[in-house]
Structure formats: structure tokens, C-alpha cells
UniProtKB/Swiss-Prot annotation:
Keyword ATP-binding: no
InterPro entries: Hvcn1, Ion_trans_dom, VGPC1_C, Volt_channel_dom_sf
Lineage: Eukaryota, Metazoa, Chordata, Craniata, Vertebrata
Name the record gives this protein: Voltage-gated hydrogen channel 1
Gene Ontology terms: cellular component: apical plasma membrane; membrane; monoatomic ion channel complex; phagocytic vesicle membrane; plasma membrane; secretory granule membrane; specific granule membrane; sperm flagellum
GO biological process, one term: regulation of intracellular pH
Entry PTM: Proteolytically cleaved in sperm. The cleaved protomer forms homodimers and heterodimers with the full-length protomer. It confers reduced dependence to intracellular pH changes.
């Protein structure tokens, strides 16, 4: 059995990765996250199970009528209260934090980068374009369409989260990249063969790879939160079931003891054995 010192060393070993993770991920917070409690949340996730085991007292044996009186108290927890209907801002907040929305954003970022890369390949004559340069125009308009979607996303995020939006450096960086990319795309519509602007556009698209990292982090974090919630619910249900079984076992032991006493009184215990 592990001593208290061994448990303390093990716990410190678990806390260290959590601290490193929290220091890294706090720079990737997005709207909807608790900006001030970010580090605390990740430490709590790492050590929650161990803390619950330390705080939870061992079950005391229950005997006789006390067990019968306490058993009815072990009732399933009441169901969650009915949720109020979401307004427009609440629906948008839920959409921005959903896993599917993040997957869509990642796909659009990758597609946008590929479109700009295709434009550069055609503009540098690495692949010979068609006579009227229709392919490059199609790629450019598709890129602008994707950027319009990203601009709408930023506007709706400002509408939903308001000042909270500016507490997250990652969101500000992403918004700056989207706005500058959109302006450069519009400028390139009227000024062709501007290789410097196109190179800057490529650089900005590469910076948007951070958006992919952000999407992956949100996706992993969301799934972890859901799994943690399910495990908590299962833990509560199993704890209630264990307590109920302990009461039942205690009653059975008392009943067996009572029957053995009756057998001894009538001199039948030796014959049964």
C-alpha cells in the first residue's frame, strides 16, 4: 500500500504537466472560455478525481434499524430543471462552441490556403493558365467568398460576446488576419500582377494555420468536457448504487446472524454445519 509521501510525489508529478498545459493553452483561449479561471480549470481537470477521493469519507457500517431508516434516503437525484428557450445570441453562442462548426472552419481555412496557392502557381506560370485567365479569377472569387464567411463570423462573434471577444489574444489575431486578407483580396481585384501583395496574402494564409490549431484545441477540449460530464454522472449513479448495496448487505448479514442465533438456541447449528 502506498504511503502518504509516495502519494504526494505522484500527485506533484501529475500537477506539473497540468501546469505546463495550462500555461500553453491560456494563449489559445477563445470566446466562451473563462479567461481568468483558465489555469485553475486545467489543474482541476487533472487532479479532480484524486481530490474527490481524499475529500470523500469512507462509508461507515450501518446496522439494524439505522440501515433500514437510511436506505430510503438513497434516492436518485432529481432530474435537471427544464432549460429556458435560447434566444438568438444564445443560439449563436452554442453554434460557435459546437464541434461541427469548428470542423467546418478548419476545412474552409485549408481550402482558402489551397486557393491562394493555386493563384500563385498560375500567376508565376508554373502551370500555364488558360487564355483568358478564367481559372485564376474563379479561384480568387472563391477565396473572397470564404473570407466573406469569416468576416460574418467575426461580426457575429462581436455581437454575441461583445467585450469578452477582446480578452482573447487568439481571437484578435485571427480577426486581424481575416480583415487584412479580405482587404488585400479586394485590392487585387483592381490591381493585377501585384506579386508583393500576393506574397503577403500567402503569408497571412500561412498565419491562419493557427486557426487550425485553435479548432483542434477546441474540438479536443469540448469532447473532454463532455466525457468528464458523463463520467461525473456515472460516478454519482454508481456511488448511490454502492451505498444501496452496502445497506442491503448489512441487512442480509444481520438477518443471517439472527437466524444463526435461532439455530444455536434450538441446538440445530451443529447439525446444519
Amino acid at each position: 500500500m502506498a504511503t502518504w509521501d509516495e502519494k504526494a510525489v505522484t500527485r506533484r508529478a501529475k500537477v506539473a504537466p497540468a501546469e505546463r498545459m495550462s500555461k500553453f493553452l491560456r494563449h489559445f483561449t477563445v470566446v466562451g472560455d473563462d479567461y481568468h479561471a483558465w489555469n485553475i480549470n486545467y489543474k482541476k481537470w487533472e487532479n479532480e478525481e484524486e481530490e474527490e477521493e481524499e475529500e470523500q469519507p469512507p462509508p461507515t457500517p450501518v446496522s439494524g434499524e439505522e440501515g433500514r431508516a437510511a436506505a430510503p434516503d438513497v434516492a436518485p437525484a432529481p432530474g435537471p430543471a427544464p432549460r429556458a428557450p435560447l434566444d438568438f445570441r444564445g443560439m449563436l453562442r452554442k453554434l460557435f462552441s459546437s464541434h461541427r462548426f469548428q470542423v467546418i472552419i478548419i476545412c474552409l481555412v485549408v481550402l482558402d490556403a489551397l486557393l491562394v496557392l493555386a493563384e500563385l502557381i498560375l500567376d508565376l506560370k508554373i502551370i500555364q493558365p488558360d487564355k483568358n485567365n478564367y481559372a485564376a479569377m474563379v479561384f480568387h472569387y472563391m477565396s473572397i467568398t470564404i473570407l466573406v464567411f469569416f468576416m460574418m463570423e467575426i461580426i457575429f462573434k462581436l455581437f454575441v460576446f461583445r467585450l469578452e471577444f477582446f480578452h482573447h489574444k487568439f481571437e484578435i489575431l485571427d480577426a486581424v488576419v481575416v480583415v487584412v486578407s479580405f482587404i488585400l483580396d479586394i485590392v487585387l481585384l483592381f490591381q493585377e500582377h501585384q506579386f508583393e501583395a500576393l506574397g503577403l496574402l500567402i503569408l497571412l494564409r500561412l498565419w491562419r494555420v493557427a486557426r487550425i490549431i485553435n479548432g483542434i484545441i477546441i474540438s479536443v477540449k469540448t469532447r473532454s468536457e463532455r466525457q468528464l460530464l458523463r463520467l461525473k454522472q456515472m460516478n454519482v449513479q454508481l456511488a448511490a448504487k454502492i451505498q444501496h448495496l452496502e445497506f442491503s448487505c448489512s441487512e442480509k448479514e444481520q438477518e443471517i446472524e439472527r437466524l444463526n442465533k435461532l439455530l444455536r438456541q434450538h441446538g440445530l447449528l451443529g447439525e446444519v454445519n
